[in-house]
Structures are given as structure tokens and as C-alpha cells.
């Protein structure tokens, strides 16, 4: 079976892992980092994903997209989306009720759905795994916050499809964290484990019982809009006000200044987890004014006090729902980067009467770790004891039901029901001779459907005339292991049925759209590769020209070359160097033809030099005549395919 990876698709950072040879490996990206920023940037020439995108964000804030996870599967008018948009330097517009990101790419305006942006991050994670494993990776388990609703889960699954992945399962982040913790611990008996998962953009708490490899989620709660970024926002606002006070200037209108400040705030926040105070120094932050300031841990804690405090409410709720007293919790496991904040660790510990949280798993990697185990299990990898004995029982995060007369929410599947699950109930008509019923499916905890989230609706028609209350309509809810639902209705008298897979009504991408996006993703990938080749050709020409120049300036070569030849070669090199300075954006072919021309002048001259017994070349080795010495030169230009196109040329002979 092909390898299957576990991907933690985070709001701010993502991480990928694989289970093989009986252990989990978290895979580092091309920059050597084990987590990759969930950033995608669009420039005049190329698309950047991950570290490269985040590194250039200050220069290009309006075309660098992040936090797609805060938009995915949501409606444009959601209060959360509207609130988040205030912090986004990039443009979010509305298209058929959904939030769409608008950027400028290669000089034209482009629109991307949150699914497409997330798929680009997933593609990057997939490529990271492929580079490490040396083969293609198609199968993946992707994690989502436990509190994600049906549309957010579907949209995440779609992002995986656009990235060309076969999504084996969508699993909940705290559950994945629980697997990571539980694999280490082979404790006897049933253990109640509270997973406190606090990342860059979301917050979840789940209570699991772990016994003999069975991981059963008892209850879950959380906030899909609370994370480390909220703390960054508080710091940014604090310093914007301080800057205003000190300098009478408002930098909040300048995207670049805000971005530089935010980057400094993120760094300061991290530093304050280990130091009691830190300083911020940003040169020429806004209108030429330098900004030097400092902040203490105590002040930071005060700025975020209400946010920190709000994390305790879901903890209480999870214990209440699971009907477990806090003294019966055996372990508290911290997952997610924000759990490194000392104040949060202290609050969790105080809540559990001084019990210390377990820090055995790396908070950044725990979720990907658990997802990788689940991926191995689902791809049928039974090679290991660890994967053989695990059974994962998750729960539905929100109650699911239908609307009955008077706009009442009648739940069929209660929150925290173990999934997969199937539940049927019989309903009837509301008025005499009613020919059909409208089945409207909702998720949420409120008593009235108008306060809950409509997932979809369908009609069951052709009910024979009968007094109200006589026809029997059986409604069945079937939730699969991904937390995604099918609903069917059957009229028992006639045997008429109708069903709905909860999909399109709430803005899920259609099959056609996904296929179109897949094709586009391929196109972008090809463009990215072409750009890499172009830069390779440019670098090849540049290093060829400079190494020729170095060779010429070597005294041993200098003595043996004819003055006219030397002059001719020198002027040709200078011409190419000048052309390079003016043509940074030329095509691959143009660079290659320049290189051919330069080789046409250089080769005969250098051949003469070798003919004149140039003692096997200058100390630096003649460029192209082998690997070269210091400043020497591999082949005829790293990307200069010119030398390879038409059979071997002289410089390739070692």
C-alpha cells in the first residue's frame, strides 16, 4: 500500500508526519523546519508557499494570504468572518455568499476560494513528504478543530481533493493529540485524559478515555476563533496606541508598517514565554520614525487577561458533558503552540487544583503525530503493534436535527454522540391532506432553528391525502466517521423515499468546481516549475560569466593569453554582465542564448590557452572544465541547459 501521511493543517502553521518502521517521523521542509507557515503569496512573477511566502510578507502584505482556515466553510456574512477581515491586509470579497480572497498575481486580478488557498498549503506539505520519502504521496489524514461544523469539514476535505490527495479521514485535532499522547503511555486500566489544544487560530478541549488502545472521545468543546493570533492582535493594538501617543502618528492605515509590527509582536510573545520581558526595535517603522520599546510578561498577561480566562469555560463544559469530576482526570495534555504561554499552563494547573499538565508531546507536532498514526491504520498498515491495536471512537461536536412545526429544533443526534452513528425517528404531517413535507436539517444547540445552522433541506412529496398526524414519515440521520452526514426520509405508506448528502446547499464546491480547481492547481505548479528553471538559467549564465572573469584575472592565464583575445573576451563578459543587470526578468531561452553567445567567444580563446600548455588550467580550474576550484563552476551553468542540449560540448569534458 502506498504511504499515507498525517497532515495537521493549521491556521498559522502546518505540519506533516509519517508512520513507518514502527515509529512516527515528523518531516522537515526544504528550509529544515518541522512546521511550515500556512501562508501563500502571489507576486508579479511567481507564487510562494510556506516560509518563502511568510518571509516576504512585509514587502507584499496585500497579496500574501494567511488564515484561510478562518474563512474555510464559512459564509461571508458570518460575524467571525467580518471581524477577521478587519485584521486582514489582503482583500476578501463576497461571491454567492462565500468569502473569496482577491489578490494580484502576475499583473492580473485573481480570485481564490479559501479551499484553494488551503489546498496550496496542503500541496506544499505533500511535496515536503514526497521529497523526504522519494516517491509520490496520495493518501492523507487531515485534521480539523473538534469544533468545526459540517460545512467546515466538507470544505477541508475539498481542499484535500484540490491538492490531489485522497483524504482517508478528517479527524479532530485534540483526538489526534490524544493518540500521540496515548501511544507513549501503556498504562493499565482506563484513563481519563483531558486534551487542551490551543493553537494559532483555534481552541479545542476534548475529554478522552483511553483503555487498551481504545480511544473514546467523551465530550468536546471549543472556540474556532480563538488562538495565538488574538494575542498578537492585542499586542499590535497596544503598540499602535503607544506609537500614536509618543509620535502623534497613526500607523494603523499602513499595511507594511502593521505587518512589520505584527511580526515583531509575534516574536515578542514567543520570547515572553521564557523571559520576563523583551524589547522591540523596528527601524523606520512609519514615516521615518524608529520604534524602540519594551514589554513585560505581566503587561502581556494583562492585555490578554480576558482571552486567557475564556479558555476555562470550555474545560468546565467538557467535564460537565462527560459527567466527570475534575478530580477524576488522570492526565492533562497540552497541544498547540499557545499552550507554551506560562500563564495558560498555570491557569490549567490551578483549575485542576495544582495538577501539573503533561508535557511529554511536542505541542507543535502532536496533532500531526496522531494524524500519521491514524493514516497508517486507515491505509491498512498492520506491520506494527501500535497501529494494530488502536480503535478510535470520536464524537459529533454539535447536535443534529430537523425543524418541526413552529420552527422548533428537534435533535435526532445529540452533541457528543459517538460517531459513526445512525438514528431514525418517525414524524407526521401537520395539516390535513398535506401532500408533502419539507425536511430541513440543522446543527446547533439552540431550541429554535433560526438560531442554529441550516445544513440543507429537501422535500418528500406524493404523500396520499390523509388527516393530519396519520402519515408516517421516518427520518434517518447517518453520520460517517468524518463527521459528515447523510439524511433520508421514507413515507411508510407508499414507500416513497428521498435523501440528501449534506453538501451543496451551504456553499460546498461542486464536483465541476473541484475539477476546475485541480486543473488550475496543476497549471500553477507547472508555472512554479518553469519559474524555477528560468532562475536556474539566469544563475547559470551569471556564474559562468563571473567565473570566466575570475579566470581572466588570474596571473597565470593572463600571461599566456593574446592581448586582443583577452580584450575581446573581457568586453563580451562585460556586455553580458550589463545585460544581466538590465534583464532580471528575461525568459529562460534568452539567458540560454546569451550563454551560447558567450561560450562561442570564450571557448576558442580558452582552447588556445589550453593548447599553449596552460598547465591543466588555472588554479581555479577553467570554468566548465570540471568542477572547478574555489569559485569554480559545476558543469556549464547550474541551470544552463545550453551546454546539454546538443550533445556534449568541450567544456563538459573533465
From Swiss-Prot:
Region annotation Disordered: where it falls in the sequence = 614-654
* Gly residues bias locations: 614-640
Q: What InterPro entries does this protein's entry cite? A: ATPase_NBD, Heat_shock_70_CS, HSP70_C_sf, HSP70_peptide-bd_sf, Hsp_70_fam
Top-level division of the source organism's lineage: Eukaryota
Gene Ontology molecular-function annotations: ATP binding; ATP-dependent protein folding chaperone
**Keywords from the named record:** ATP-binding, Chaperone, Nucleotide-binding, Stress response
- The answer on whether this UniProt entry bears the keyword Oxidoreductase reads no
Could you tell me which NCBIfam families the record lists for this protein? PRK00290.1
PANTHER family the UniProt entry points to: HEAT SHOCK PROTEIN 70KDA (PTHR19375)
Q: Of which family is this protein a member?
A: Belongs to the heat shock protein 70 family.
Name-wise, this protein is Heat shock 70 kDa protein
Native species: Trichophyton rubrum (Athlete's foot fungus)
Q: Which gene produces this protein? A: HSP70
